Amino acid sequence: AGVEITELSTHLQGQLVAVNPAYDEAFDAFAPAHLHGKPAARKDWAIDQMMKAAIASERLGLSHTVSFTGSLAFPFLYPWPQRPAGLVEEAFAELGRRWTPILNHYQDHGQDIGFEIHPGEDVFDGATFEMFVDACGGHEAAMINYDPSHFLLQQLDYLQFIDLYHERINAFHVKDAEFNPSGRQGVY
């Protein structure tokens, strides 16, 4: 018996693969101090860490990891003020350019990555996951880390999500969540 490792988590490293400049200072906290204030070097470090995690996962006899996609477009989630035409599409194209080589490396090492559908990430619901997979050429190593606690706050149907995406779910994280809106406060 004992404790069994089911997957490696690379949430912080994955986040740093794609950071909107508006978040640079905040996300520096996730990287080593010598990378603070150096977004390009921080991104390169994060990609290197992701590549190393694929090898570590393989050596541990695992086949799944979990991560975040990053947040190039998330500051523009709400459609007001109006986004410039093509902004979201270009952000997802850039995600595809950054993540496809990482996904290829994972696949070469018998791994896949379950991306957590999470507020604050560019992949925050089923529609954005589909956009991400399309941007990565339908990559088979792009999977979902299913954590329905976030779905409650986003008012997503967490059961129908399973019906729609069960073939892409590679991990399941469990924790409690509740939504208690009032006349003074909503989701956040």
Q: What name fits each language-model region?
A:
Residues 5-10, 65-67, 113-115, 142-147, ...:
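Hydrophobic faces of well-ordered beta-strands that scaffold small-molecule active sites
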Residues 1-6, 49-64, 157-170:
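Short amphipathic alpha-helices and their capping/turn segments at secondary-structure boundaries
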Residues 2, 40, 152-155:
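Residues at alpha-helix boundaries and short interhelical turns
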Residues 6-7, 14-19:
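Short active-site-adjacent helix-start/loop capping segments
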Residues 17-143:
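Active-site acidic/histidine proton-transfer and metal-coordination neighborhood
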Residues 10-14, 69-73, 117-121, 148-150, ...:
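Active-site-proximal loop/turn and secondary-structure-junction residues that shape catalytic pockets
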Residues 92, 122, 126-130, 150-188:
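Gly/Pro-rich active-site loop or hairpin
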Residues 1, 9, 20:
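N-terminal substrate-binding region of glycoside hydrolase catalytic domains
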